[in-house]
Amino acid sequence: MARGLDLAPLLLLLLAMATRFCTAQSNCTCPTNKMTVCDTNGPGGVCQCRAMGSQVLVDCSTLTSKCLLLKARMSARKSGRSLVMPSEHAILDNDGLYDPECDDKGRFKARQCNQTSVCWCVNSVGVRRTDKGDQSLRCDEVVRTHHILIELRHRPTDRAFNHSDLDSELRRLFQERYKLHPSFLSAVHYEEPTIQIELRQNASQKGLRDVDIADAAYYFERDIKGESLFMGRRGLDVQVRGEPLHVERTLIYYLDEKPPQFSMKRLTAGVIAVIAVVSVAVVAGVVVLVVTKRRKSGKYKKVELKELGEMRSEPSL
């Protein structure tokens, strides 16, 4: 009996350790990025999380870089895991989703090939800024995107939002949810139903711990589309003076520190179609004008000949 009492403290200690271990395991998640695999294998049992697809250790106290997030999304598609599976229309730009190459800091490399023989150069946001070429294409640097314009169109409301209230709410959102320094949100414009949010950040302005405007814009875009990257959150719930802000369309424009290098091949099918329609219309107009003039000229000649014939047939006095 005494021996059983001696073992009781040891059993309680083992039970406490097991409970602590299970609790640590259950709390080992990344609140700012659910596309991670977390464990307590860090030094001293510390929770550490690695991005899916790249296995890069991420800092869960801030936003994960856009390059690592795109890498994780492509990994989720390939593995069939239903984490953040966007619709086929939920693309970042006209080129759609691709499997990016990231450097050791999680930033986009200057040249991207999507694991194919076709390559192109991208900016710091990962958006193509040159024509596509082969693997001999050289991209000397990653040109920084210093200005991002987010354009939103909200659903019809009983009355327009107050501009000042809307401005304050969006600034609070970017500061509290995306940890973006207030100085990097330069302006909020509003003309019902269009809202424009301007983010500006030069390389010299960004500190070591500052969130990049590219990452903040990407997290915001996923939130707006109901595909939140935050752990345990379902989309975005923004209210202005108690009135919910429901967004039905999002467009994001990127301005780089250097102009893009596109050739005339960059013309889209839509632009080419417009040019073709205008050209056909001009040619048709010219043809109609020429035919009309010829018809009028022919009538005049017939009248002149008829009058001349009548004059000849009249008897002389």
Swiss-Prot record:
UniProt topological domain (Cytoplasmic) ranges: 292-317
Gene Ontology biological process terms from the UniProt entry: negative regulation of branching involved in ureteric bud morphogenesis; negative regulation of cell motility; negative regulation of epithelial cell migration; negative regulation of ruffle assembly; negative regulation of stress fiber assembly; negative regulation of substrate adhesion-dependent cell spreading; positive regulation of stem cell differentiation; regulation of epithelial cell proliferation
Disulfide bonds: 67-102, 113-119, 121-139
Primary localization: membrane
Subcellular location: Membrane
Recorded superkingdom: Eukaryota
Entry-listed glycosylation sites: 27, 114, 162, 202
Topology of this chain in the membrane: Single-pass type I membrane protein
Any one GO cellular component localisation term in the record: basal plasma membrane
Any Pfam family hit: EpCAM_N
Extracellular compartment residues: 25-270
Swiss-Prot/TrEMBL keywords: Disulfide bond, Glycoprotein, Membrane, Signal, Transmembrane, Transmembrane helix
Ranges annotated as spanning the membrane: 271-291
Domain Thyroglobulin type-1 positions: 64-139
Span of the signal peptide: 1-24
SUPFAM superfamilies (alphabetical): Thyroglobulin type-1 domain
Tissues/organs with expression: Expressed in kidney, lung, ovary and testis. High levels of expression in immortalized keratinocytes.
Assigned protein family: Belongs to the EPCAM family.
Annotated function: May function as a growth factor receptor.
PANTHER family (UniProt xref): TUMOR-ASSOCIATED CALCIUM SIGNAL TRANSDUCER, TUMOR-ASSOCIATED CALCIUM SIGNAL TRANSDUCER 2
Protein name, per record: Tumor-associated calcium signal transducer 2
Originating species: Mus musculus
Gene: Tacstd2
